[in-house]
Structures are given as C-alpha cells and as structure tokens.
Amino acid sequence: MSATFTQTILFTDTDGRARWRERPIALTEGKPAAMLSPLMPSGGYQLRTSPVGFRSEFHCTGEPQWVFILGGQMEIFLQDGSSRVFSPGEHFYSADTLPAGTAFDAQLHGHWSRQLGPDPLVTLFVRG
C-alpha cells in the first residue's frame, strides 16, 4: 500500500514572484495503520501568537520552514493578488526566500499575511 502526504509549498519562482505548488511526500515507513514519512531534518521550532487584526507587510521568508496553524486563521496574499486561507490543523512549507544577491522589491517579491476571524492566530514554525 502506497500512501502520500501532500506538502503545500510557497516558493520563489524563476521570475522572482512567490507562487504555490504541491509535492507528494511518500509515506514509506511505519505500519499500514500508521504510515510515516522518512525522518526529516529540522533546525528548531518557534511558536507565535498574533493578535486579532494582525497584518504583515510584503516580505520573503528568511529560512525555509513549515508553518502549522494551531489556532485562529491565517490568510496569505501573493503579488498576483491571489490568497489562500489556512485554518487550525492545516499547514504549508514557506520557502519563498529572496534569491541570492537580489535586493528586496516590495512590488515583486514575497507575500504578506493576516489574521482572520475572532480568534488570535497561533502558529508553529519548524525550520528545515
């Protein structure tokens, strides 16, 4: 039996703009009742809480990291005007880093995010 986990990835495309894509991660370990991915490296984790009304400016991710929504809702906006909403239990891999040697341009690069709804946003960031 072959199982997969879908990794939603926010990445920097060749034109410098942030975009979304999905990649399957094979769950090749464990037992049929509890399939696991291979162990992945990580560089630590951080917890964050953002109050109702939080909104960031356009920015790029400093280091690639998994973002898990623990409470509240988070909306991510891209330069093309599109957005995605993530709710508790959902996740994405934030890898829209600024290309080496490139100066940040808030009209081209990155994404911005905001808290949605009546509850503070609580997130877990896992580097790696």
Which role does the model predict for each range below?
Residues 1-11, 81:
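Short acidic, Pro/Gly- and aromatic-enriched capping/linker segments at domain boundaries
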Residues 14-58, 64, 119-123:
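A short glycine-rich, His/Asp/Glu-containing loop-to-beta-strand
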Residues 51-54, 72, 78, 98, ...:
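Short acidic (Asp/Glu) patches
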Residues 62-80, 90:
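Glycine- and acidic-residue-biased ligand/ion/polar-headgroup-sensing regions
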Residues 63, 82-85, 106-109:
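Ubiquitin-like/PB1-type beta-grasp interaction modules and other compact soluble beta-rich domains
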Residues 80-98:
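Short acidic-glycine-tyrosine-enriched beta hairpin
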Residues 93, 102-128:
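A short hydrophobic beta-strand segment most commonly corresponding to one strand
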